[in-house]
Amino acid sequence: MKMKLVTAAVMGLAMSTAMAATDATSLATDKDKLSYSIGADLGKNFKNQGIDVNPEAMAKGMQDAMSGAQLALTEQQMKDVLNKFQKDLMAKRTAEFNKKADENKVKGEAFLTENKNKPGVVVLPSGLQYKVINAGNGVKPGKSDTVTVEYTGRLIDGTVFDSTEKTGKPATFQVSQVIPGWTEALQLMPAGSTWEIYVPSGLAYGPRSVGGPIGPNETLIFKIHLISVKKSS
């Protein structure tokens, strides 16, 4: 988080707090409504991020600065406080991220250990697992080939994070341009096949988070229907 953004967010929330403290029920003008809306949005963000602040102190700081009154803290003191806040927040976020990564790795490994013993599940040397739902009889793609597929991706808890059903049309891409688990599985699939693949985190996105519901070290499940293969020239 950039220091200027932190400062702006704090100042913005302080301004809205000051306005609300003056007259909590008076939202007669567009300026009042805008101020309240900004304050509510910032307040929700602070709450969601676990940032603990004193609204009254923020309001006091805003009022002092806007009125030209003597500030209760020096510029250096405020800079030091904000720097410490930023470092503490980053440390907290890093600890939370690492904890989540460890938890996801343990859960994923436990899932794969149990899943490999289920009927029809094949385990490859890489750790990738798959189950054939429908066997096609078409050509198998190579790394440089282009495929058209329908798919649904979900987490091991069943949460769907992506699906061609949402877009209403299949996806087309080069086999080498997807996560390693997909690249490996697709090269084994004859066109026309439908497989369910179980992708260890190391063959998916690894320890990084790609946003949305996919966290670090997530084991992913995909149901893939390989519609067609376009061989590279």
UniProtKB/Swiss-Prot annotation:
Signal peptide residues on this chain, from the entry's feature table: 1-20
What are the alphabetically sorted keywords of the record? Cell outer membrane, Isomerase, Membrane, Rotamase, Signal, Virulence
Spell out the PROSITE patterns in the cross-references: FKBP_PPIASE (PS50059)
Q: Which InterPro entries match?
A: INFPOTNTIATR (IPR008104), PPIase_dom_sf (IPR046357), PPIase_FKBP_dom (IPR001179), PPIase_FKBP_N (IPR000774), PPIase_FKBP_N_sf (IPR036944)
EC number(s): the record gives 5.2.1.8
Can you state which reaction this protein catalyses? Answer: [protein]-peptidylproline (omega=180) = [protein]-peptidylproline (omega=0)
- Give start and end of each PPIase FKBP-type domain: 144-233
Q: Where's it found, cell-wise?
A: Cell outer membrane
GO CC annotations, alphabetized? cell outer membrane
Annotated GO molecular function terms are:
peptidyl-prolyl cis-trans isomerase activity
A Pfam family this chain is assigned to: FKBP_C
Set out the biological process GO terms recorded for this chain's protein. protein folding
Query: What does this chain do?
Result: Essential virulence factor associated with macrophage infectivity. Exhibits PPIase activity.
Query: Which family would the database say this protein is a member of?
Result: Belongs to the FKBP-type PPIase family.
- The molecule here is called Outer membrane protein MIP
Per the UniProt record, the lineage of the source organism begins with: Bacteria, Pseudomonadati, Pseudomonadota, Gammaproteobacteria, Legionellales
